Amino acid sequence: MAKKTIKVTQTRSSIGRLPKHKATLRGLGLRRIGHTVELEDTAAVRGMVNRVNYMIKVEG
């Protein structure tokens, strides 16, 4: 069975954000507005998504 994945898209800029939030975006592999990455749906990734949920959109 294939592992479940989620698509994460950055919708807002990281300029002026907390350093931890910028680092979280980098950890998710996001670099710029409109950038989309497909990530494995794990507890660690979900925690990162929850930290920066105001800057991203999640599908799947």
Swiss-Prot record:
UniProt KW Ribosomal protein keyword: yes
CDD domains: Ribosomal_L30
MF terms in GO: structural constituent of ribosome
Coiled-coil residue spans: none
GO biological process terms, semicolon-separated: translation
PROSITE patterns, A to Z: RIBOSOMAL_L30
The keyword Acyltransferase belongs to this UniProt entry's keyword annotation: no
SUPFAM superfamilies on file: Ribosomal protein L30p/L7e (SSF55129)
GO (cellular component) term, any one: cytosolic large ribosomal subunit
Entry keyword set: Ribonucleoprotein, Ribosomal protein
Similarity comment: family membership: Belongs to the universal ribosomal protein uL30 family.
NCBIfam families per the UniProt record, alphabetical: rpmD_bact
HAMAP family: Ribosomal_uL30_B
Quaternary structure (record): Part of the 50S ribosomal subunit.
Protein name (record): Large ribosomal subunit protein uL30
Lineage: Bacteria, Pseudomonadati, Pseudomonadota, Gammaproteobacteria, Alteromonadales
Gene (UniProt): rpmD
